[in-house]
Amino acid sequence: MNRIYRVIWNCTLQVFQACSELTRRAGKTSTVNLRKSSGLTTKFSRLTLGVLLALSGSASGASLEVDNDQITNIDTDVAYDAYLVGWYGTGVLNILAGGNASLTTITTSVIGANEDSEGTVNVLGGTWRLYDSGNNARPLNVGQSGTGTLNIKQKGHVDGGYLRLGSSTGGVGTVNVEGEDSVLTTELFEIGSYGTGSLNITDKGYVTSSIVAILGYQAGSNGQVVVEKGGEWLIKNNDSSIEFQIGNQGTGEATIREGGLVTAENTIIGGNATGIGTLNVQDQDSVITVRRLYNGYFGNGTVNISNNGLINNKEYSLVGVQDGSHGVVNVTDKGHWNFLGTGEAFRYIYIGDAGDGELNVSSEGKVDSGIITAGMKETGTGNITVKDKNSVITNLGTNLGYDGHGEMNISNQGLVVSNGGSSLGYGETGVGNVSITTGGMWEVNKNVYTTIGVAGVGNLNISDGGKFVSQNITFLGDKASGIGTLNLMDATSSFDTVGINVGNFGSGIVNVSNGATLNSTGYGFIGGNASGKGIVNISTDSLWNLKTSSTNAQLLQVGVLGTGELNITTGGIVKARDTQIALNDKSKGDVRVDGQNSLLETFNMYVGTSGTGTLTLTNNGTLNVEGGEVYLGVFEPAVGTLNIGAAHGEAAADAGFITNATKVEFGLGEGVFVFNHTNNSDAGYQVDMLITGDDKDGKVIHDAGHTVFNAGNTYSGKTLVNDGLLTIASHTADGVTGMGSSEVTIANPGTLDILASTNSAGDYTLTNALKGDGLMRVQLSSSDKMFGFTHATGTEFAGVAQLKDSTFTLERDNTAALTHAMLQSDSENTTSVKVGEQSIGGLAMNGGTIIFDTDIPAATLAEGYISVDTLVVGAGDYTWKGRNYQVNGTGDVLIDVPKPWNDPMANNPLTTLNLLEHDDSHVGVQLVKAQTVIGSGGSLTLRDLQGDEVEADKTLHIAQNGTVVAEGDYGFRLTTAPGNGLYVNYGLKALNIHGGQKLTLAEHGGAYGATADMSAKIGGEGDLAINTVRQVSLSNGQNDYQGATYVQMGTLRTDADGALGNTRELNISNAAIVDLNGSTQTVETFTGQMGSTVLFKEGALTVNKGGISQGELTGGGNLNVTGGTLAIEGLNARYNALTSISPNAEVSLDNTQGLGRGNIANDGLLTLKNVTGELRNSISGKGIVSATARTDVELDGDNSRFVGQFNIDTGSALSVNEQKNLGDASVINNGLLTISTERSWAMTHSISGSGDVTKLGTGILTLNNDSAAYQGTTDIVGGEIAFGSDSAINMASQHINIHNSGVMSGNVTTAGDMNVMPGGGTACR
């Protein structure tokens, strides 16, 4: 916009014209004809003026000259060519009452023409008419290059044409219009043209300007106007394009105060780039009425409305119009900015149109307008501030960031009332931010929308008691490119709207935290349309309430047509009438209720109405279903997923809860109910509601935790037990299994428990199809309750069926169901084997009872027998389909034993065989055929059909080397000796070793397998010796002998847990071997002689009273020392088991590889005796590591979990390289501790004692009072020891040596001498 006027002579019209380019918002350019003097020089001569007049086309007439201290009074009618007052000197012209001065030509009149001149014209009741004889207005320069003053008082009247105050650089012009009926009329009025101009209208004085009024016309000029005390300035005629300019290129200021009045058309403040304009409207009854207000057009403009001042705007206002401009409006102290127009088109305000704009309303200021937009164009930046009680903006809509950047801050009980649609971030480039704080409020009334992020970016932040209230809908992220964010930040803040749509077509985010409240009692939509994405986070005791007493929808919909996400965390609460997740077929919705006291409360819950919906209840979050019904996958093609804990495939999490629900129903789509939680307690996670729905695609997925189904569920589809434990506690005799009619798959890590807790009187028949290779456990209310399968179960289950309290018949459908499965018979289970071959995957005995339909004597094969791939009849672990199971190898086998039956073997047991073969002799009827056999069967008890044990019928004394050392019980028993199944045989059942005697087991030359195994139970108080050239095994887990176990030669293998009974000592001779074979054994004391070997093979050995190991320990597993001292001598390089040292127990080492590469869990005492080298084991626990007997060891393991204590005795040394080598342990140092570190290390450990500390390496070691408590010598050989505290560290070391390249720094008080060697030093850090 060009506000530089060019004055030209129009020969046709015979007038001067002032031409300017007035750019309108509609893009038009207009020219205003203004009469203007050509006298632009700073100093004039009469010749120059005459030339100018000649050039103007008029004959020069007589001019009135008042100069050289003249005073001229006019009180009659006069006419002059020009009035020249104060040409070079001082002149005063008084036009008194009765005086009527006029012009005869077109000459310019001047008051204060040249430098140092001073002219004054006083119009005191007279009239001065500056029009020529043709009634053409003529120029008047007041303060051309000198000082000029025009005073209009006492009803004086001046009819001016083109009036310029300070018309040239250095000129100072002043016009004072004072008193009622004192009048100045102008056409074009410049106040500060090139110099300085002042206009004062006071005491009801009256001024008019009919073409343009300018304050501060040219750069460097200054124009000041004061309208006060009833004074009035009228800047207008019938042409609405007339302009009032404050600071065109110079500086202008207009002040309206004490009842002053100004009426103007278009008002421009800070018109050009160098222009600075200020408009002040202050005091009661002070008013300016304008048509359009441009504040900061190209330059800088400021409007101050204060102390009840009033601006009336007939049409719109722009603040910060063009790029680079700056406009400010301050409405304060009950000031009022009022827009008079009717309709939105003529009442709007742009704060930051293309430039920078500010609107500040405070101290009961008031703005009444149409739509207010902050940041209109892309380059525009607008800031609105409303603060203080009774400070109010009332408008027809508020837009922040239309295409530019808009900000609004409402605080300290300030109020914005928008009676029309409002937006933040309207266009794609628009950014709108609103902050409502400290009791501020924004009200959006009537049936209009509020949109946060229409196509741009919008942010609404509410905190410290801020409030937002809307009587209609609020959108966040309306169009595809829109991004809207709402932040509610504390308990005193609230957001009230009829409805909220978060992510309509764009992206919306709502964060409600710290006890804040969001009310949307009509509805809440998250992800409204296809491209929409919405996220709502309700956290930290905050509330989103969609419920009222009215009959409105009160719906919460997450993923309407787009993508929605609702996170309720850390005590957040959401309340709705009905909640729907993923309404339409392409929508996606996710709801997460996470944390204690986090709550989603709804009447009914729909997860996956037609789209893909997920509800996750985790970490004690709660879903309260007041209507009782939860629907998953309501219509096709919906997928509705309800997660308890975590989603399928994720890491398990603490479970959430569902209250007041009566059912979870799978709909016509795909319903998925996932249990993936961390509740592994015996009580488990209780599910009381009914799971129902005839959905072939429905799924119950169990991934982790222990879950209990208590209802008689009727759902179809699938039950997938992938991991964890699913307990079915409800069943009926008519086939209601608690898993409906679903197909059940138990994956390898998964476990399905079938209990009878809700129906103690009934049997249980599994009518479900069963697949997978995991574990199914059955425990009914008592052992006499029948468990069985049906034909529907199929033959695909390949896992383990672990039967506890139950009765089971192995025939027909039951046998078929276990075709590929392992049958594990536990205590209180009775399984009857019917006639014929019953072929199943495997049989494992764990305390149960198997009844065979056969008798003895009989044929070699029972009438009813079992065929298996794997038979497990020994104590210990077995592996089935890659999963490990633990059994005790015990149980009862019932057969028909005639009474009496006289067996000739009972009179003469075969005793000519090796003792190790006595348990396997006289093999009779085969009960089980097996491809693979684990265990000897020696722990099984043979009983008759009445349950009575088939007792030994012969006891023999067993003598060795002429001395009776034991007694042997012989009779019918069970054996796997042939290696292909389970048999009834007649042989040795038990051995009882006499106290004080030793029973030696040695296989017959070359014997192996069953012929070198003792499966009979070994008891008694005597000792057991193994003396073999090859190997002897013990396979009875019921052994309970108390004497010592001597492995004198060869190998002892333990094939069952507890095979060593209650032995008081395990003593292994030179070259002898003990093979734990993965089993668990306990001994009182342990003696491993030089040259002996213990093969752990992932087994466990517990030593209760210590001992000594001089041989080799090898393999992985566990060595548990629970008491006494176990001395381990020598190295065990192939040992990698975990060594656990209990409190009150000790392990001592004389070699750094005494415990190989295994970890050490030390809660007792680990003693290093005369050990040198690198200790690479990782140590954990809270015990003690003691370095004694001139030990010198470098700790290289990761000991970060060790919180115990390192003790260094006098003459011993420990060294470390990294912080993890010391863990979090303390150090009692009476020897030498060497710390070699290349990195900085802030040591927080306690180091005490009388020993020395040596610092090596280039790193910085920082000590505190605890780590500097040792009293010995400190040698800083390399790097730096620093003392890292603001207060001085008390270093107890008695002597400090700082070697070459060593440094000591920090704030420290030393207890002894300090020796700084050449190259060493100290420093202040």
From Swiss-Prot:
The gene is ydeK. To E.coli YfaL. It comes from Escherichia coli (strain K12). One of its GO terms (cellular component) is plasma membrane. Pfam families: ESPR (PF13018), PATR (PF12951). The keyword Methyltransferase does not apply. Transmembrane segments: none annotated. The keyword Transmembrane does not apply. Coiled coil: none annotated. It is found in: Cell membrane. Residues 1-18 form the signal peptide. This is Uncharacterized lipoprotein YdeK.
